[in-house]
């Protein structure tokens, strides 16, 4: 990153995962005037770990939960804020799942000079590769999928996790592929 990107700015980071936390903490370190993480559910429902959330808050990141971005607000071609729908928690899609959120009909505009999108991902369907109900790829102990010579690891298998876990899974999958080739 370039320090001038964040320095002196009111930064909003949209997202609730560890990537969003990393982006927010980076903005704090790069001397942003304020950094607020905007998430559509409650703090407890964030996919980011409790440890990551605690560290971010200790470093000065503010959390604005139960807010879902609706539109950017600007003046003379310059961003001035983000209008958010105020949300309320609703039942999860499945037992043990994170709660969903629905708009209350109210809105709030958060001031911002810079907005960072740190939103999740969705696995793309791959022909013949079996997935679980959460669309995570099902693998064997050797990282093999249901398609011969196709291997998977990282977030595509576990869902959102840490960078280090994804790197470790990549190394393990590479070792399994190498073992199969030899």
Question: Which residues does each PLM region occupy?
Answer:
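Redox-cofactor binding/interface segments in oxidoreductases and associated redox assembly factors
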Residues: 13-14, 84, 117
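A conserved short coil-to-beta-strand element within the FAD-binding core of flavoproteins
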Residues: 66-78, 87-90
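Rossmann-like NAD(P)H-binding beta-loop-alpha module
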Residues: 2-32
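A conserved FAD-binding loop/helix module that cradles the flavin
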Residues: 23, 156-182
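Cofactor-binding loop segments of dinucleotide-utilizing enzymes, especially the Rossmann-like FAD-
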Residues: 16, 39-42, 155
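Rossmann-like dinucleotide-binding cores of NAD(P)H-dependent redox enzymes
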Residues: 24-71
């Amino acid at each position: 990153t370039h320090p001038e990107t964040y320095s002196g700015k009111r930064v909003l980071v949209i997202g609730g995962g560890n990537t969003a936390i990393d982006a927010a903490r980076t903005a704090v370190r790069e001397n942003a005037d304020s950094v607020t993480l905007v998430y559509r559910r409650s703090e407890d429902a964030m996919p980011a770990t409790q440890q990551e959330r605690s560290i971010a808050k200790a470093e000065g990141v503010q959390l604005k939960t139960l807010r879902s971005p609706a539109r950017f607000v600007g003046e003379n071609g310059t961003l001035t804020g983000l209008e958010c729908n105020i949300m309320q928690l609703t039942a999860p899609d499945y037992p043990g799942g994170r709660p969903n959120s629905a708009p209350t009909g109210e809105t709030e505009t958060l001031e911002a000079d810079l907005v960072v999108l740190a939103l999740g991902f969705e696995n793309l369907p791959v022909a013949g590769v079996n997935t679980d109900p959460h669309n995570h790829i099902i693998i064997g102990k050797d990282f093999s999928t249901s398609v011969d010579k196709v291997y998977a690891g990282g977030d595509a298998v576990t869902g959102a996790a840490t960078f280090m876990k994804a790197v470790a899974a990549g190394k393990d999958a590479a070792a399994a592929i190498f073992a199969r080739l030899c």
